[in-house]
């Protein structure tokens, strides 16, 4: 750009010099021709001098035409990026030819002819002065045109810079929107994974509940069979057993209801996830629409830039066509100033619009953060509800196990009162094995529930503080459970000591004889004397809680503790 400007200035200086030289030379030639026409006809050298002057006049005419042609080419090619070196070379050749013609014109013979003809030097000097003034005026006009061109180029350059800055800012805004979209997609992916994982956990829980129901049905059926065998001699025990079964079924129904409530809580969380997912999809669509708007704005800016370029070309063409008219150039400058002001106003309006869009986007992001915080709190509440439901299920399971142990203990007492029949003893042992198996299955289900709860806690991504609180709660519960089991172990030891003391003082009753050929081994929890009525047999109670002692329940509790 600087090189082109330097070449242009040099060309203008050469043009001024060449124009002045041509004007002076033409003036001198004209004066010489006039003087040659008035010379006397009898002079011997006038013919040759006249011919020489005519030749010089033709030569100067050709030089004048060349200078006008070069000037016209300069104006025509200026807007198309003319080659400054070529133009300077042509001006040098024109200058050289002018100097050669001027030297020929100002030779000794010409000076003698001028002296003889008596040309008025004063008039020639006056004409030369007038011509120089005219040349200076034209040079001033050319300088003014040059200044106007420089100002127009500055205005066009300013417009280019402004549009380039707007284009860069639009690209940056588009990149920021794309980053926001990618972040939202990244946030949606783990939410979708959590929803899928929650669905899988719900399906697993449903399957576990069905399995638990089937196992409880099998256990109930086996218990019914055992009690039907014992019902032949103990109808009262059968009634109590039916009452216990009904109570157990009601408690099982309550446990099912609690589990269904927990499942509903999980379903509610799943629905909230789905709603949040739909909301995120809507936000992504909105951001994509904003991106399309920005793309359209960028294309509009490119069209405006192309229009500005076309306007620049049109302006340059108009300046080339209106160089001789200073008033029109001034008017064109005013038009350019008005266009620049209008462009500035448009740019300011675009900036305000973009600023409002960015502020609206920031508000939307803040609202999304608030919604996410509320959702997190809701998930926390759901997690607490799930924990409470788990605790309630564990409590109900423990109660069911205790009731079942009590029923089994009563069944064992009833079976022990049937004169030590081997069949009843085997049934009691089989019932004991089934109870232990049911306890093991219950323990495995409890472990599965704990694992499920752990998975839920991990899926909610608890903070370090919440993890510490949960760990403290679990440790406190484990400690309390250990203390309770220690107490039960002590009570079991006391119970065994009392049972040993009771077994040393059997109470014999006449009328009941041992069956020959059948060994009657003593059972745990029963006295060796089988002659007492089953309903009057004394039940041992725990000194701490007042409940009936059950060695099988105590062993099951120890097994649960070991598993924990």
From Swiss-Prot:
Positions of short motif LPXTG sorting signal = 542-546
Coarsely, its chief localization is: secreted
Checking PROSITE patterns in the record gives: GRAM_POS_ANCHORING, SMCR, SMDRR
> Where are its TM segments located?
none
Q: Which UniProt keywords apply?
A: Cell wall, Coiled coil, Peptidoglycan-anchor, Phagocytosis, Repeat, Secreted, Signal, Virulence
Q: Where in the cell is it found?
A: Secreted, Cell wall
Q: State the disulfide connectivity.
A: none
Per UniProt, what is one GO molecular function of this protein?
actin filament binding
Family designation: Belongs to the M protein family.
What's the protein name? Answer: M protein, serotype 12
Task: Name the gene for this chain.
Answer: emm12
């Amino acid at each position: 750009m600087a090189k082109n400007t330097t070449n242009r200035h040099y060309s203008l200086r050469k043009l001024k010099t060449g124009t002045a030289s041509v004007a002076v030379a033409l003036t001198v030639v004209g004066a010489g021709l006039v003087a040659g026409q008035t010379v006397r006809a009898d002079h011997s050298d006038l013919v040759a001098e006249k011919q020489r002057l005519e030749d010089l006049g033709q030569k100067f005419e050709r030089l004048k035409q060349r200078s006008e042609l070069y000037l016209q080419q300069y104006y025509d090619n200026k807007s198309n990026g003319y080659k400054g070196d070529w133009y300077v070379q042509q001006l040098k050749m024109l200058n050289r030819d002018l100097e050669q013609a001027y030297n020929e014109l100002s030779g000794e013979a010409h000076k003698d002819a001028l002296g003889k003809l008596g040309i008025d030097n004063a008039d020639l000097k006056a004409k030369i002065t007038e011509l120089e003034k005219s040349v200076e005026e034209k040079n001033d006009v050319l300088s003014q045109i040059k200044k106007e061109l420089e100002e127009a180029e500055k205005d066009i350059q300013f417009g280019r810079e402004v549009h380039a800055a707007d284009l860069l800012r639009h690209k940056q805004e588009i990149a920021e929107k794309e980053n926001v979209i990618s972040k939202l997609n990244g946030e949606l992916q783990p939410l979708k994974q959590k929803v899928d994982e929650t669905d899988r956990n719900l399906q697993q829980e449903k399957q576990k509940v069905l399995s638990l129901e089937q196992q409880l049905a099998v256990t109930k059926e086996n218990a019914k069979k055992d009690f039907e065998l014992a019902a032949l001699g103990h109808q009262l025990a059968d009634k109590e057993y039916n009452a216990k079964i009904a109570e157990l079924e009601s408690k099982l129904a309550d446990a099912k209801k609690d589990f269904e409530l927990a499942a509903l809580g999980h379903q509610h969380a799943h629905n909230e996830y789905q709603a949040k997912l739909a909301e995120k999809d809507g936000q992504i669509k909105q951001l994509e629409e904003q991106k399309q708007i920005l793309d359209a704005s960028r294309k509009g800016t490119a069209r405006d830039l192309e229009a500005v370029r076309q306007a620049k070309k049109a302006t340059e063409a108009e300046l080339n066509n209106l160089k001789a008219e200073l008033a029109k150039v001034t008017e064109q400058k005013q038009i350019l100033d008005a266009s620049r002001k209008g462009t500035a106003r448009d740019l300011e309006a675009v900036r305000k619009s973009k600023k409002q869009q960015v502020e609206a986007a920031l508000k939307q992001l803040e609202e999304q953060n608030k919604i996410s915080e509320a959702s997190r709190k809701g998930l926390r509440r759901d997690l607490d509800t799930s924990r409470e439901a788990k605790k309630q299920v564990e409590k109900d399971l423990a109660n069911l196990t205790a009731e079942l142990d009590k029923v089994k203990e009563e069944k064992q007492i009833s079976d022990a009162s049937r004169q030590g029949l081997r069949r009843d003893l085997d049934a009691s042992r089989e019932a004991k094995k089934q109870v232990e198996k049911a306890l093991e299955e219950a323990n495995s289900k409890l472990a599965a529930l704990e694992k499920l709860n752990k998975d839920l806690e991990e899926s909610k991504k608890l903070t370090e503080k919440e993890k510490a609180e949960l760990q403290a709660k679990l440790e406190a519960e484990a400690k309390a459970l250990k203390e309770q089991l220690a107490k039960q172990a002590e009570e079991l030891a006391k119970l065994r000591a009392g049972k040993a003391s009771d077994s040393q003082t059997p109470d014999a009753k006449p009328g009941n004889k041992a069956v020959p050929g059948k060994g009657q081994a003593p059972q745990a929890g029963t006295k060796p004397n089988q002659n007492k009525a089953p309903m009057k047999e004394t039940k041992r109670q725990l000194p701490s809680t007042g409940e009936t002692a059950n060695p099988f329940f105590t062993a099951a509790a120890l097994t649960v503790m070991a598993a924990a």
